[in-house]
């Protein structure tokens, strides 16, 4: 079970979610471009359903967003990482019910082939994807999420190393 989200200064709660750092055998990280915002690249992420634990949510979100579960769990962030939505997005996303998100992030080793990744899922969120070096990741991300991505990289980049052939 996840803890109750705290209220923000604006009086709105934070949405509880998970994020996924999917790492290929070359030590590169998966990023995808959002359908609703072509300038926005991100790693897969999503909400935690009622009664769902964060790890289960991460596996579900991976399959829902990129069409695969071909992965091995490597680790997770020590705590929850959060961001506030910019004012101009707060009223549009999630019906204006949340100030931002608090997320538990997980590192996974991708064990499949690139052909296993399928963005044409039941509810597509992305229209393109690629593998990037971890040191270029943060620069691709929308500014309001960058501090979280910096923390994710600081905690999980140690898993982003090439694997022996």
From Swiss-Prot:
For the protein in the UniProt heading, the enzyme class is: hydrolase
| A matching Pfam family | NUDIX
Q: Which GO terms describe its biological process?
A: nucleoside phosphate metabolic process; ribose phosphate metabolic process
> What EC number(s) is this enzyme filed under?
3.6.1.-
Alphabetical list of PROSITE patterns matching this protein: NUDIX, NUDIX_BOX
Domain Nudix hydrolase, residue spans:
13-154
Motif segment (Nudix box): 46-67
In the record, the note on similarity to other proteins reads: Belongs to the Nudix hydrolase family. RppH subfamily.
Tell me the function of this protein.
Accelerates the degradation of transcripts by removing pyrophosphate from the 5'-end of triphosphorylated RNA, leading to a more labile monophosphorylated state that can stimulate subsequent ribonuclease cleavage.
Instruction: Write the protein's name.
Output: RNA pyrophosphohydrolase
Species annotation: Rhodospirillum rubrum (strain ATCC 11170 / ATH 1.1.1 / DSM 467 / LMG 4362 / NCIMB 8255 / S1)
Highest classification ranks of the organism: Bacteria, Pseudomonadati, Pseudomonadota, Alphaproteobacteria, Rhodospirillales
Which gene is the coding source of this polypeptide chain?
A: rppH
